[in-house]
Structure formats: C-alpha cells, structure tokens
UniProtKB/Swiss-Prot annotation:
The gene is pyrB. Heterododecamer (2C3:3R2) of six catalytic PyrB chains organized as two trimers (C3), and six regulatory PyrI chains organized as three dimers (R2). Pfam families: OTCace (PF00185), OTCace_N (PF02729). Keywords: Pyrimidine biosynthesis, Transferase. This is Aspartate carbamoyltransferase catalytic subunit. The keyword Transferase applies. PROSITE patterns: CARBAMOYLTRANSFERASE. Pathway: Pyrimidine metabolism; UMP biosynthesis via de novo pathway; (S)-dihydroorotate from bicarbonate: step 2/3. Gene3D superfamilies: Aspartate/ornithine carbamoyltransferase. InterPro entries: Asp/Orn_carbamoyltranf_P-bd (IPR006132), Asp/Orn_carbamoylTrfase (IPR006130), Asp/Orn_carbamoylTrfase_sf (IPR036901), Asp_carbamoyltransf (IPR002082), Asp_carbamoyltransf_Asp/Orn-bd (IPR006131). Belongs to the aspartate/ornithine carbamoyltransferase superfamily. ATCase family. L-aspartate binds at residues 86, 169, 227. It is an enzyme of class 2 (transferase). One of its GO terms (cellular component) is cytosol.
Length: 308
C-alpha cells in the first residue's frame, strides 16, 4: 500500500476505482452482518484504537461494531482521564499508542487538519472519523453506498445538498466522492452559509451553487439536508430560524414536489422542525436510518482495506 493510501484522511486520497472497490467490499460486509453470527476473522490479531476528541454517537459506535465484526481487538480512547489532560501532546499520545501495538487508529478531532499531523508520526493506518470543518470520509462513503443501493449507480445522479454548507465536513468529503463518480451536485443554502462560490468551484468545477431550494426539487434524485452547526458559526451568519426553515427546510410540502424515485438523506444529528420536519424524516422517501445501518458495513470495508 502506498504512503498516500496507508491513511484515509479524505476521499481525495482515493481514485474513483478505489472508491468503487470499497463500496463493493461493503456489499460483502453487509452480507456478513445479515448472518446469525455477525463476525468474520479478517482482522483477528489486529488492534484498532478509536480516538475521539469530539462527541460522537453514530460514528463512534459504528466503528466499534465494525471492528468487532472483523474480530479486531478494539480499544476506546477518550481524552478525559488520559495523559492528554495532563498536557501530553497529540503526537506523544499517538507514539504511545504505537508503542502499545496499535495497528489502526480511528480519530475524530475538533481541529481541522489534525489527522495529517498524526499520520506523519504513526506507522500504522489512520482513518479520519471527522476533523473540524475539513473532512468526514466514512460518512461520505456510507452516503455513496446508500445512494448506489437505491439508484444503481452514482453517475448522472442529481444530488442537492441543502443547509449549512460552509461549516460542513460532510459536504467536502461528499463532493470528492460524488464528483469522482460522476454525479451532478448542487449546493443550496443562504449566501452566508455557503460562502464565496469560487471557494467551491475552484476545487470542484462542476458543482453548482443555488440560493433557492424550490426550483431544484422537481429534478432531484437525492436531497441531503444538513443541520445548522451553530457551535461553529460566527454571530450574524444565520437568519431567524423560522425564516431559514421557511426557505430551506424539508417540509411535507417540499417532499411532495420530489420525483417518486427520489430519496431524502441526512448525516445526523437532526434538528427536527428546522432543516427537516419529522413527517419527512420518517417518510418512505427518507433513508436516514438506512444510512446509519449502512455505516457499519462501509466502515468494515474500509478497516479491512486499510489493514492491508
């Protein structure tokens, strides 16, 4: 495995072919999870350390289940109660874990770019479970897997991502995956929550920017709603919540305008009644719980690949 492929920091680390291979492997892992005994010995003898410096439910538990289903030894690391609280640096912590025999580190960190620092000091494989506003590659992979399972392929899909684009690491990783696999992507939201369009089109030239959701619905194959990340916002970026919901919220009325084959997605956690209404989140069009379920198989596939 090349140095670049030794770690999974974002989907720009992978070619379109490699992404497709991960999705194909996830199909096999999904079959494993359908068995009475949901376990294979693929990572027996390997140690996976989950380092989460930021709160998580879906991603953390999903990675734990994925590693255990592959028969790995799983260690849950939290900053609280560790030497990090005594001032130990991130690099020294990683070196300690390496000395203790960690083969794979799964890391979530609030600081964008932190995985790149860790990767320079870890001889094993590093998987980014989300870093600041930068990237969340496994969320993008499970989103791609879910889209493909419903539509057969990613190429030529019309994908609308609506909400807090500016602060979303999910958007950035999805853009790498979706554009590499040939989807047509539109980012939609208030100008203050998208930022300069040139920021996006300079890296992803085929991406469209829109500020009005309603005209996009009739031709959408996928609509992905994003929560408002108020914890990352500066004052003044967000209009009144009621006004935001009126213009950008996925309401039952907007759901009715989607094509019959369209699916509604959300990476979670949801703010119901703001970016998505409960009636939409629980509708037959929504595949939100399916995304969560698919996350285990997709993360199994990536762990298996990174284990070499």
């Amino acid at each position: 495995m090349t140095e670049r492929r030794r770690h999974a920091i974002d989907l720009d680390d992978f070619t379109a072919t490699e992404i497709e291979e991960i999705l194909e492997t996830a199909e096999s892992m999904r079959e494993v999870l359908s068995r009475e005994i949901k376990q294979v010995p693929a990572l027996r003898g390997k140690t996976v350390v989950n380092m989460f410096f930021e709160e998580s439910t879906r991603t953390r538990i999903s990675f734990e289940l994925a590693a255990r289903a592959l028969s790995a030894n799983v260690v849950a690391f939290t900053a609280r109660g560790s030497s990090v609280e005594k001032g130990e640096s991130l690099v020294d912590t990683v070196r300690t874990l390496q000395a203790l025999g960690a083969d794979i580190i799964v890391m979530r960190h609030s600081r964008s770019g932190a995985p790149y620092l860790v990767a320079r000091h870890f001889r094993g494989a590093l998987i980014n479970a989300g870093d600041g506003r930068h990237a969340h590659p496994t969320q993008a992979l499970l989103d791609l897997y879910t889209m493909r399972s419903h539509h057969g392929q990613i190429r030529d899909l019309n994908v609308v991502i609506v909400g807090d684009i500016l602060h979303s690491r999910v958007v950035r990783s999805n853009l790498w995956g979706l554009t590499r696999l040939g989807a047509r992507v539109t980012l939609c939201g208030p100008p203050t929550l998208i930022g300069p369009s040139a920021f996006w089109t300079a890296t992803w030239p085929t991406v469209r920017i829109a500020y009005d959701l309603d005209p996009l619905l009739a031709e959408a194959d996928v609509v992905m709603a994003l929560r408002l990340q108020k914890e990352r916002m500066q004052h003044g970026l967000l209009p009144a919540l009621r006004e935001y919901t009126r213009i950008y919220g996925l309401t039952p009325e907007r759901l009715a305008r989607l094509p019959a084959h369209a699916i509604v997605m959300h990476p979670g956690p949801m703010n119901e009644g703001i970016e998505i209404f409960p009636e939409v989140a629980t509708s037959a069009t929504a595949v939100i719980e399916e995304q969560v379920t698919n996350g285990v198989a997709v993360r199994m596939a990536l762990l298996y690949r990174m284990a070499g």
